[in-house]
UniProtKB/Swiss-Prot annotation:
Family: Belongs to the universal ribosomal protein uS9 family.
A GO biological process held by the record: translation
Pfam families reported in the protein's UniProt record: Ribosomal_S9
Organism: Hyphomonas neptunium (strain ATCC 15444)
Record's GO cellular component terms: cytosolic small ribosomal subunit
Ribosomal protein listed as a keyword: yes
HAMAP family the UniProt entry points to: Ribosomal_uS9_B (MF_00532_B)
PANTHER family, sorted: RIBOSOMAL PROTEIN S9 (PTHR21569), SMALL RIBOSOMAL SUBUNIT PROTEIN US9M (PTHR21569:SF1)
Entry protein name: Small ribosomal subunit protein uS9
Biased composition (Polar residues): 1-18
Region ranges (Disordered): 1-37
Amino acid sequence: MTDTSNSLQDLGTLTGAPSAQPVKSVEPKIDAQGRAYGTGRRKEAVARVWIKPGSGKIIINGRDQETYFARPVLRMVIAQPLIEAGRATEFDVIATVKGSGLMGQAGAVRHGISRALVAYEPGLRAVLKPFGFMTRDPRVVERKKYGKAKARRSFQFSKR
């Protein structure tokens, strides 16, 4: 610290001051058909999701959302990112999902829709992140251990 400064104007010229880096603006990632892509995962389910401007139609594995996800709670889960972003009727969603059960698949589609929305409109990341839609849920089934009946349950023990 050999440099000393007596005024605030000299503060920026000191050698220890970091230079201001320009903030990079994130460009939308849209393909030739005008679609944005996002991959979502939950448990063992993997969803590949494409969104494009449209009327709000959601198609999963070639079927309408009402036929693929018959339970209303599952349809609510996949619509959450679109509703919170205020884009429920602005985008058509096409998704292919495989693996896991219906709840895991719905979570994977939700994650994929969130990622695709951010790819299409990067400013939505600040809206979706606080709701946890951008975060991959790390909880998966615990593996079975040898010497145990299940992951944690021991075999029945008889004292006598």
